[in-house]
Amino acid sequence: MQDDPRYRVEVEVSPRFLAHQSTPDEGRYAFAYSIRIQNAGAVPARLIARHWQITDGNGRTEQVDGEGVVGEQPWLRPGEAFHYTSGVLLETEQGQMQGHYDMVADDGTEFIAPIAAFVLSVPRTLH
């Protein structure tokens, strides 16, 4: 069903480093990521679950699965978007996340909305 244009969701991610919530001396690097999920298909659909693969700079990978996002299972009409912000802690200055959302259209069709890999990185300051 992934190639059917009736069932298409676009995901945009904007990550940022949270210096004020990080303690590098203790190996704690906090990142926030803002997500925009838009129903680009022709059928209303609900986001049911999330699946993340989080990889730190040492190659350690963690799988995170759960219902909905930020306590919600948003229902999106065609063209409608849902925004949320969440966060993650890493033990390294950089890493990446990728994953997908499980979606169910109003007609009962199940499909996934892929989340392309994005980089989490502490910005460098030039002196």
From Swiss-Prot:
GO biological process: one example: error-free translesion synthesis
Domain ApaG: residue ranges:
3-127
Q: Where does the source fall among the domains of life?
A: Bacteria
User: Which PROSITE patterns is this protein grouped with?
Assistant: APAG (PS51087)
The record ties this protein, via PANTHER family, to: F-BOX ONLY PROTEIN 3 (PTHR14289), POLYMERASE DELTA-INTERACTING PROTEIN 2 (PTHR14289:SF16)
Q: Which HAMAP family does the annotation name?
A: ApaG
Query: What protein name does the entry list?
Result: Protein ApaG
Taxonomic source organism: Xanthomonas euvesicatoria pv. vesicatoria (strain 85-10) (Xanthomonas campestris pv. vesicatoria)
- Gene designation: apaG
